[in-house]
Amino acid sequence: MARHPRWTLSQVTELFEKPLLELLFEAQQIHRQHFDPQQVQVSTLLSIKTGACPEDCKYCPQSSRYKTGLEAERLMEVEQVLDSARKAKNAGSTRFCMGAAWRNPHERDMPYLEKIVQGVKAMGLETCMTLGMLNESQAQRLANAGLDYYNHNLDTSPEFYGNIITTRTYQERLDTLEKVREAGIKVCSGGIVGLGETVTDRAGLLLQLANLPTPPESVPINMLVKVKGTPLADNDDVDAFDFIRTIAVARIMMPTSYVRLSAGREQMNEQTQAMCFMAGANSIFYGCKLLTTPNPAEDKDLQLFRKLGLNPQQTRVLAGDNEQQQRLEQTLMTPDTDDYYNAAAL
């Protein structure tokens, strides 16, 4: 198998320095070579264990080190998670993502996690989890249970990383991604814009992701959501064009990956989001809440989809059954139905 070309920091920096419209044109051309530009992947995200995380990530309201007013919750029961997954599927979601605020899962938690994955998979949904660091055995057990994707973000460049997190190393994050890949699970990994990093740091983050032995299949690009009580609560706002530029560079560097417009969409107007889609973003989380931070209300997403002529990505299911796709299309048109899914209500 031919190895994908490796990027250099100077090459990535040159992309960031291109005139914005020229950069967007290049990104859109590359995007159209690999994806239908009118199709957007729609996923649902559920926090299955909230708060009391021992890590010191300065952006995160779930850290036990910061007083953010977030109440910690224990790991949800298996049937609770499966009930949420059923509602997500009824609303038309094709991927169900589950997050737990852990440094790493304990061995006692693994049987529950395996049952959750098996149960969600049995519904015909793609599965994704983010649970912190994994060892080889844990990664393999999740793979054997049927986990499709594992999310573990690099957050920022190796050089800036120590300013944001001290309780786990950058190499530990890379090691987890390697274990996930070796277990046969697809990788979801990205970062955050607005931590106080420089453009060179943004280039460094994308360089790390694109130069992995196999680039992530899914690349979430988050805009910092500033939460009172966290050390980054008073950070400067991110310029919209700088964020759009980051999306475009990610698309150019990782042409076959899904680039997810992730946290921070609540802070973006429709024009900014539209330019992100033009820059190559082709995946979003659908629902009012992303773990513990706000996400645009569903009706706003539906209105924006209509204005831009975007559609939920077509679902590949067995025997030509397109019921799941039809459900999502109906939901996008009729947000007042019983199946209309509100992630924040779970």
Swiss-Prot record:
<dbReference type="InterPro" id="IPR002684">
    <property type="entry name" value="Biotin_synth/BioAB"/>
</dbReference>
<feature type="binding site">
    <location>
        <position position="128"/>
    </location>
    <ligand>
        <name>[2Fe-2S] cluster</name>
    </ligand>
</feature>
<comment type="pathway">
    <text>Cofactor biosynthesis; biotin biosynthesis; biotin from 7,8-diaminononanoate: step 2/2.</text>
</comment>
<feature type="binding site">
    <location>
        <position position="53"/>
    </location>
    <ligand>
        <name>[4Fe-4S] cluster</name>
    </ligand>
</feature>
<dbReference type="InterPro" id="IPR010722">
    <property type="entry name" value="BATS_dom"/>
</dbReference>
<feature type="binding site">
    <location>
        <position position="57"/>
    </location>
    <ligand>
        <name>[4Fe-4S] cluster</name>
    </ligand>
</feature>
<feature type="binding site">
    <location>
        <position position="60"/>
    </location>
    <ligand>
        <name>[4Fe-4S] cluster</name>
    </ligand>
</feature>
<keyword id="KW-0949">S-adenosyl-L-methionine</keyword>
<dbReference type="GO" id="GO:0009102">
    <property type="term" value="P:biotin biosynthetic process"/>
</dbReference>
<comment type="similarity">
    <text>Belongs to the radical SAM superfamily. Biotin synthase family.</text>
</comment>
<keyword id="KW-0808">Transferase</keyword>
<feature type="binding site">
    <location>
        <position position="97"/>
    </location>
    <ligand>
        <name>[2Fe-2S] cluster</name>
    </ligand>
</feature>
<dbReference type="InterPro" id="IPR013785">
    <property type="entry name" value="Aldolase_TIM"/>
</dbReference>
<dbReference type="Pfam" id="PF04055">
    <property type="entry name" value="Radical_SAM"/>
</dbReference>
<dbReference type="GO" id="GO:0051539">
    <property type="term" value="F:4 iron, 4 sulfur cluster binding"/>
</dbReference>
<dbReference type="InterPro" id="IPR024177">
    <property type="entry name" value="Biotin_synthase"/>
</dbReference>
<keyword id="KW-0411">Iron-sulfur</keyword>
<feature type="binding site">
    <location>
        <position position="260"/>
    </location>
    <ligand>
        <name>[2Fe-2S] cluster</name>
    </ligand>
</feature>
<dbReference type="Pfam" id="PF06968">
    <property type="entry name" value="BATS"/>
</dbReference>
<feature type="binding site">
    <location>
        <position position="188"/>
    </location>
    <ligand>
        <name>[2Fe-2S] cluster</name>
    </ligand>
</feature>
<dbReference type="GO" id="GO:0004076">
    <property type="term" value="F:biotin synthase activity"/>
</dbReference>
<keyword id="KW-0093">Biotin biosynthesis</keyword>
<comment type="function">
    <text>Catalyzes the conversion of dethiobiotin (DTB) to biotin by the insertion of a sulfur atom into dethiobiotin via a radical-based mechanism.</text>
</comment>
<feature type="domain" description="Radical SAM core">
    <location>
        <begin position="38"/>
        <end position="256"/>
    </location>
</feature>
<keyword id="KW-0479">Metal-binding</keyword>
<keyword id="KW-0001">2Fe-2S</keyword>
<comment type="subunit">
    <text>Homodimer.</text>
</comment>
<dbReference type="InterPro" id="IPR007197">
    <property type="entry name" value="rSAM"/>
</dbReference>
<keyword id="KW-0408">Iron</keyword>
<protein>
    <recommendedName>
        <fullName>Biotin synthase</fullName>
        <ecNumber>2.8.1.6</ecNumber>
    </recommendedName>
</protein>
<dbReference type="GO" id="GO:0005506">
    <property type="term" value="F:iron ion binding"/>
</dbReference>
<dbReference type="InterPro" id="IPR006638">
    <property type="entry name" value="Elp3/MiaA/NifB-like_rSAM"/>
</dbReference>
<dbReference type="GO" id="GO:0051537">
    <property type="term" value="F:2 iron, 2 sulfur cluster binding"/>
</dbReference>
<keyword id="KW-0004">4Fe-4S</keyword>
